[in-house]
Amino acid sequence: GTRFMATKEAGIHQNVKEKMTEADELSTNLMFRTMHNTARVFKNSISDQVVEIESTGSATFEDVKDLVAGQRGRVVFEEGDLEHGIWSAGISVARVKDVPTCKEMVSRLVSEAEEIIDGRLQSVKA
């Protein structure tokens, strides 16, 4: 899902897509761990606040609900304000380096898989 967010066809603001191309392995936060409902989101000031609130050890959803409200995330996706709310992003966001079409991205994925199979996994290829 994360990789498809950064495609030309994805209906989210270009700012989000461009920010994803700048990401690295440290660009996500795990939230709601203390509430046993872990979510990985893109690291920004809002997700940092949620993680900080949770670090007290006694946080409840009531303590963070205004920060994580869906309407705030909608503003991120529709208006491109990257610090307005949280937005889901998997660790694979670190591998996003461009914003291709879906067709280009899937073709590249297939080509890369074939290279791995033909190159490194030749002995297991049927």
Spans of model-derived segments:
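Conserved active-site-proximal phosphate/metal-binding subdomains
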Residues: 2-126
